[in-house]
Design a protein with these regions (language model features):
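N-terminal export leaders
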Residues: 7-16
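C-terminal segment of classical bacterial N-terminal signal peptides
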Residues: 22-30
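N-terminal, intrinsically disordered, polar/charged segments of Gram-positive cell-envelope systems
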Residues: 34-36
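Local sequence-structure signature of Cys/Sec-based thiol-disulfide redox active-site neighborhoods
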Residues: 38-60
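N-terminal, post-signal-peptide region of Sec/Tat-exported proteins
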Residues: 55-100
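Thiol/selenol-based redox catalytic cores and closely related redox-interacting motifs
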Residues: 84, 90-172
Length: 172
């Protein structure tokens, strides 16, 4: 009987701690997201994509829905843009953008862009390699999809010399 009490007290304590951590992380993510319109001055986004890419258009809408002004440039050769703004080969995705002096590559969420302009690190840009399911522009909207089907993914920072490091971690 005594072992049962200890087990449940320990389990309850772990639950309280994890709930508090989840709450704190949720509040922090909300602060960064809400800061876009209130405190962060993010310049106009200059986006480059091919005409045939639908997910790129959805990513642009994600930025616009979060208050950013986006110039949508449809280009014949997206790879030329990736060379012009030296994006490491292993980080390349379907679309690129410039915001002030930063390059944004792939399906980077608004929260990471906000973080970039809050911290203002000395980097060339940030990227989401590939096309993770659930990232902005890669959402599935149907009665069968659930957020738990989405992937966790990393936003990677990169320098002009190609040095990379984890900038942000995104979980569904």
């Amino acid at each position: 009987m005594e072992i049962n009490k200890v087990f449940f007290k320990t389990r309850f304590l772990k639950y309280l701690i994890s709930s508090g951590m989840l709450f704190a992380n949720t509040i922090n993510a909300h602060r960064i997201s809400a800061a876009t319109q209130e405190n962060i001055d993010i310049p106009k986004v200059i986006s480059y994509r091919s005409a045939s890419c639908g997910c790129c258009k959805k990513w642009i809408n994600h930025l616009r829905d979060n208050g950013l002004e986006v110039v949508d440039n449809i280009v014949e050769d997206v790879s030329a843009i990736k060379i012009q703004y030296p994006i490491p080969n292993n980080l390349r995705s379907c679309h690129s953008a410039q915001i002030a002096n930063y390059t944004i590559e792939g399906h980077v969420p608004i929260e990471s862009i906000n973080k970039l302009f809050i911290e203002k690190p000395n980097i060339n840009g940030i990227a989401v390699p590939g096309m993770p399911l659930g990232s902005p522009g890669m959402e599935i909207h149907s009665h069968e999809s659930h957020s738990h089907d989405y992937e966790s993914y990393k936003v990677v920072s990169f320098s002009k010399t190609g040095k990379t490091k984890i900038f942000d971690k995104i979980s569904p």
